[in-house]
Amino acid sequence: MPAAIVHSADPSSTSILVEVEGMKCAGCVAAVERRLQQTAGVEAVSVNLITRLAKVDYDAALIEDPTVLTTEITGLGFRAQLRQDDNPLTLPIAEIPPLQQQRLQLAIAAFLLIVSSWGHLGHWLDHPLPGTDQLWFHALLAIWALLGPGRSILQAGWQGLRCGAPNMNSLVLLGTGSAYLASLVALLWPQLGWVCFLDEPVMLLGFILLGRTLEEQARFRSQAALQNLLALQPETTQLLTAPSSIAPQDLLEAPAQIWPVAQLRAGDYVQVLPGVRIPVDGCIVAGQSTLDTAMLTGEPLPQPCQVGDRVCAGTLNLSHRLVIRAEQTGSQTRLAAIVRCVAEAQQRKAPVQRFADAIAGRFVYGVCAIAALTFGFWATLGSRWWPQVLQQPLPGLLIHAPHHGMEMAHPHSHSPLLLALTLAISVLVVACPCALGLATPTAILVATGLAAEQGILVRGGDVLEQLARIKHFVFDKTGTLTQGQFELIEIQPLADVDPDRLLQWAAALEADSRHPLATALQTAAQAANLAPIAASDRQQVPGLGVSGTCDGRSLRLGNPTWVQVATAKLPTGSAAATSIWLADDQQLLACFWLQDQPRPEAAEVVQALRSRGATVQILSGDRQTTAVALAQQLGLESETVVAEVLPEDKAAAIAALQSQGDAVAMIGDGINDAPALATAAVGISLAAGSDIAQDSAGLLLSRDRLDSVLVAWNLSQMGLRTIRQNLTWALGYNVVMLPLAAGAFLPAYGLALTPAIAGACMAVSSLAVVSNSLLLRYWFRRSLNHSVSV
């Protein structure tokens, strides 16, 4: 199966996804990104800790075989392979390592922890189990913990050290290894009087595995939205094998065979039974039913459908059997496009993450340096400056008894070397680069998933961050603030030509156009039962009009300036109506007056944005009087309207606003909005808009409702707030806990951490970040329930 390669507009530039197993912290991410960026031909790299994917942009002329990328990654000690399918509907949710295996490791570690603890409890209760109070017994337990449930962690840590890319596992290896080696020395040479740390490796690995198992479950839950989307695609369907030989009226009862959905092709006929999801985008050729389209469109009520209607993959057939001719299958369906957009959004990093990445890239080196300094300081200067710390007990340590058993008492004094070793180990295991690495991607993962559930497709975490900072919203008029369903209310002839012929010419020039004004002219011609005529040499100029030849006449249809006909005075119409002018080479021929209605939710959306301190403007290519009339209907002042603007001038207007320091969001739907959408800090396109507008936008509102703008803005602000909370926690945790573990509070307050407690703190830290990101689901849904419905 070919690798999932996506070619960009640049023929020499290629993007590919690489699955990377074994990454545990931000240090792992930084190591992979650094190694790939050093590879000749690689242009850009983005590695996601949550999805365990690396997106690599590279020059295909310099890298002919992309497996060289996986070779570079495996050289760091990680397992890597190219993603082998570009159909997002067939891709499993990353779950590495499997939760089942991790739970087994946790169960073994918990058993060892209980057995180890029982020796202490039995000693306290004066009823120890035979042998459990012996240090050799605990030495064997520690070996079992290290080589059993802890083996994968220690192996990954050693690989990181060996390859020059130390990570979280490397810190655990150094901490547990140091504790165990020191304990062996104490066990083999009891005359040294050293304390044994034999319970520390067991407790430390138990806490770490508990934290990672809970963290893995939380990660899996954070991908719930993507899982829900994937679940909309059935695996099999009923395929009609020879539909051409079956009469149309017999298609519903024709025999069918079970067929894998992944093997369907355009032109296939499928039967869809009641209670089954539709597997393809296509057209109904037999039957009528009702469909549940809520997951894709947000429409809560079942929608009737009949022969000739188009349906989308993932919608649920509710009542009767249907036969559908497939038009788009697999990766070409609308559902696949949504899943792909969500997956790509989760892969793209928010700018705020660069700060965490900059720290995490050298975090492990810094921790190792702090641990070394801690050991050196307390072994020499610290114990001399504050000798009283040597008289303080070190809680949780096992000490030698003369009979090679163990006690839970503490010696009255410790050697400086013992104190230094204890604190250095605590520094190694308390540090948490995991929290830094998880702070941003977990929040983005949850936020983009929530957005998808609301029919909002976000291009990436960077778009969410930009949207959260937006305070200036600019709306296109036609099809955005209005319904885009124009009605021709008047034909005003300006020359001696039959009005029906004028309408035929206008409809011919606008044939095949999706613009709302064009649709209105075509609909009016059909309603008048006018025979369609052909137009040749048609040429569309976005935002201005269209030209062509009809009945031997060279015609232009569009705004009066563009049709370039000198006239003393243009006729006037309704202030709220939109005009389209038809002219030939000599004169104006007609003016078509069309009227549109505002979207029902437009006024409330505009007022809701303004009530939250946002500035709202209208930017339109329509007449000034028409745009101002709409603004007044929406409660906006005439000063907020900029009308009669060409497409390139729209982009210039957005650029001018942003040059004043304002981050601007542009909401539009047409071809003429594409330059402005691309220029704005955040471009927002409605689903009914043109393909060019959708491609230029960072946000796509698939439910084609303006209130989705409010939902997206609210979600982006909540998501950014969650990211900041996560980063504050991750940084604050390390800023506080590293000095505490290093003994900074030991002389004055007698506060320090044992390695086991340090390991527990580390596990709790990363779990707190993931849990806080999951809370975003709760707070967002609560905000939806308490927000004003528009």
Swiss-Prot record:
Topology versus the membrane: Multi-pass membrane protein
Q: Spell out the reaction equation it catalyses.
A: Cu(2+)(in) + ATP + H2O = Cu(2+)(out) + ADP + phosphate + H(+)
Main localization of the protein? Answer: membrane
Q: Does the keyword Protease apply?
A: no
Residues forming coiled coils: none
Which residues bind Mg(2+) per the record? D669, D673
Subcellular location per UniProt equals: Cell membrane
Please give the biological process terms from Gene Ontology that the record holds: copper ion homeostasis
Q: Describe the family membership recorded for this protein in Swiss-Prot or TrEMBL.
A: Belongs to the cation transport ATPase (P-type) (TC 3.A.3) family. Type IB subfamily.
Mind telling me which PANTHER family this protein's record contains?
A: ATP7, ISOFORM B, P-TYPE CU(+) TRANSPORTER
| Annotated residues for binding of Cu cation | C25, C28
Checking NCBIfam families in the record gives: ATPase-IB_hvy, ATPase_P-type
State the UniProt keywords alphabetically: ATP-binding, Cell membrane, Copper, Copper transport, Ion transport, Magnesium, Membrane, Metal-binding, Nucleotide-binding, Phosphoprotein, Translocase, Transmembrane, Transmembrane helix, Transport
Q: Which residues lie on this side of the membrane: Extracellular?
A: 126-134, 190-193, 381-416, 750-753
Can you name one GO molecular function term for this protein? ATP hydrolysis activity
- List residues traversing the bilayer: 106-125, 135-154, 167-189, 194-211, 358-380, 417-439, 727-749, 754-776
Task: Specify the protein name.
Answer: Probable copper-transporting ATPase SynA
Record topological domains on the Cytoplasmic side: 1-105, 155-166, 212-357, 440-726, 777-790
The protein's matches in CDD domains, at most eight in alphabetical order, are given as: HMA, P-type_ATPase_HM
Can you tell me which residues form the catalytic site? D476
Q: Any idea what job this protein has?
A: Involved in copper transport.
Entry's Gene Ontology cellular component terms: plasma membrane
- Report the EC number(s), separated by commas if there are several: 7.2.2.9
